[in-house]
Swiss-Prot record:
Keywords annotated in UniProt: ATP-binding, Coenzyme A biosynthesis, Cytoplasm, Magnesium, Nucleotide-binding, Nucleotidyltransferase, Transferase
Entry's Gene Ontology cellular component terms: cytoplasm
Major site of localization recorded for this protein: cytoplasm
KW Nucleotide-binding (keyword) present: yes
Compartments in which it is found: Cytoplasm
Residues where ATP binds: S11, F12, H19, G90, L91, R92, E100, Y125, S126, F127, I128, S129, S130, S131
Complex formation: Homohexamer.
Source organism phylogeny: Bacteria, Bacillati, Bacillota, Bacilli, Bacillales
SUPFAM superfamilies (alphabetical): Nucleotidylyl transferase
Metabolic or biological pathway, per its Swiss-Prot or TrEMBL entry: Cofactor biosynthesis; coenzyme A biosynthesis; CoA from (R)-pantothenate: step 4/5
Gene that produces this protein: coaD
Name of the protein: Phosphopantetheine adenylyltransferase
Catalytic activity: (R)-4'-phosphopantetheine + ATP + H(+) = 3'-dephospho-CoA + diphosphate
GO BP annotations listed: coenzyme A biosynthetic process
Keyword Phosphoprotein: no
């Protein structure tokens, strides 16, 4: 029987407990999870791709079936490259769905063999976004409930806090 593989894409700038919630729950459902750091042309980055990958790798080291990559191209091409037929997308709120539906429709047009699976973020993480975490960190407030300790340290270093 062939391995089941899925891709979890995102900018992960930085990874949060909300991201980890989706990754950990997905790791129980697939043989391999490929976390893919994508460059979002509409977002400026705080961390470069290598830094993001390092933060993710540290965050998922307890999960043996996770591989972390970065990719500068179409997500469906990355899926083909790693042999994944499923894209996993986390939803925090209903407001995320409209954007995600457009992405899913485009991916389906580009590669009809790829399916997208949506997972609702656990309620206690549904308000967390990387952007909000960075904003709070810049004001030197406590971000420990939102990100792993090593991510908190990296953000403090970035913001000279």
């Amino acid at each position: 029987m062939s391995k089941t593989r899925a891709v979890i894409p995102g900018s992960f700038d930085p990874i949060t407990y909300g991201h980890l919630d989706i990754i950990e729950r997905s790791a129980d459902r697939f043989d391999e999870i490929h976390v893919c750091v994508l460059k979002n042309s509409s977002k400026g980055g705080t961390f470069d791709s290598e830094e993001r990958m390092t933060l993710i790798e540290e965050s998922v080291k307890h999960l043996p079936n996770i591989q972390v990559h970065h990719f500068n191209g179409l997500l469906v091409d990355f899926c083909d490259q790693v042999g994944a037929k499923t894209i996993i997308r986390g939803l925090r709120a209903v407001s995320d769905f409209e954007y995600e539906l457009r992405l899913t429709s485009m991916n389906k047009k580009l590669n009809s063999n790829i399916e997208t699976m949506y997972m609702m973020t656990s309620a206690n993480y549904s308000f967390i976004s990387s952007s909000i975490v960075k904003e709070v960190a810049a004001y030197q407030a406590d971000i420990s409930p939102f990100v792993p300790p090593h991510v908190e340290r990296a953000l403090k270093k970035k913001f000279n806090v």
